[in-house]
Amino acid sequence: MGKYFGTDGVRGVANQELTPELAFKLGRYGGYVLAHNKGEKHPRVLVGRDTRVSGEMLESALIAGLISIGAEVMRLGVISTPGVAYLTKEMEAALGVMISASHNPVADNGIKFFGSDGFKLSDDQENEIEQLLDQTNPDLPRPVGEDIVHYSDYFEGAQKYLSYLKSTVDVNFEGLKIVLDGANGSTSSLAPFLFGDLEADTETIGCNPDGYNINEQCGSTHPEKLAEAVLETESDFGLAFDGDGDRIIAVDENGQIVDGDQIMFIIGQEMYKNQELNGNMIVSTVMSNLGFYKALEKEGIQSNKTKVGDRYVVEEMRRGNYNLGGEQSGHIVLMDYNTTGDGLLTGVQLASVIKMSGKTLSELASQMKKYPQSLINVRVTDKYRVEENIHVQEIMTKVETEMNGEGRILVRPSGTEPLVRVMVEAATDADAERYAQSIADVVEDKMGLDK
């Protein structure tokens, strides 16, 4: 991570950390690095946003910065992050930009870039933009007169994206009753249109954005509301998206949550059966449940683990030419169809498996037995020394021996806070909690703030 760019673009409290002034600079410098300096006089740039009240303010500043470098901007309006990624590649734009802070609260916002290939930026590209941000007044081109280009609205882009998503499945969803939770964000209108066009009987919650209620007790980070709605409406299943539509969490007909691991397993199993799973491999992160790996092993499907973060999943998928990967949190990447996590795409693929199999979502999900998980955060003086602490390693070895293959331990430094995260999966809830606490006690005793 750099000074401005985190693992998913530039984020901060809107109008405090992510100001219009910074948005203008990101537009100007990002447009120069990723488009103008490649020789295009008027590179095409697509700009989308989620439903946050600060989105229009930042959008105006960003577009001004892009136009100041000579870009031809097409404003997509409210659309999902994967929608921007898809359209950037499909329309051969030089650059795509999404204004969103994903699943974060309404006060936050963010700006993320996509290259002409639809992928997020490389570290080198982000560093080049950061170097310009740190200069007082970089000497960059300033078109004048007839060389300044109008921006245009291209709200039809969302429909183009939805038409593409419909084309990725071979069946309609007639006979399926589905509850959709748009997190009062980017998918609030997209999801009902998509599943309605595919002839599903839909109910909606979290699809009435007012600029302030994005992710508020709804969406993929609060699936309990969706579970209630599925039971109340006697629906076949429910799908919850996050604020910018790159995550999905499902709920089965019994109101039980079906997370990203289970969704990956269900879709991966179908792809494997149809000989469509590249390398017979699914890429996940170290946070995926032990039950996920055991279920894959039973099916004869291989797995590859990365660090936490969808960008690392995508990097590994590109390296090995794999076409399915994701995170327990619901970032699912189906590389045959899009370059980034796509909640709507994953949703139609999951619904397609349910429709074609004739099985309920609970039946499909039950093939993967989730191990109970316990997570404890310990505040420490130096989180990066946990791997070399002999006392921590000793207790981890002791616990692993006791679990005898029926559990998993993950002890790692937090990426954003002075914490060590202790995660244990075991055969029972009691075992997971007991083992996690025994490790956390040693971490706190040997590495805590008073040490």
Curated annotation (Swiss-Prot):
GO BP of this protein: carbohydrate metabolic process; peptidoglycan biosynthetic process; UDP-N-acetylglucosamine biosynthetic process
Residues annotated for Mg(2+) binding in this entry: S102, D242, D244, D246
Post-translational modification: Activated by phosphorylation.
Note describing how the cofactor binds: Binds 1 Mg(2+) ion per subunit.
Organism domain of life: Bacteria
GO-annotated molecular function: magnesium ion binding; phosphoglucosamine mutase activity; phosphomannomutase activity
Residues annotated as the enzyme's active site: S102 (phosphoserine intermediate)
Catalytic reaction equation(s): alpha-D-glucosamine 1-phosphate = D-glucosamine 6-phosphate
Primary enzyme class: isomerase
Keywords noted in UniProt: Isomerase, Magnesium, Metal-binding, Phosphoprotein
Cofactor: Mg(2+)
Family recorded in the similarity comment: Belongs to the phosphohexose mutase family.
Protein's recorded name: Phosphoglucosamine mutase
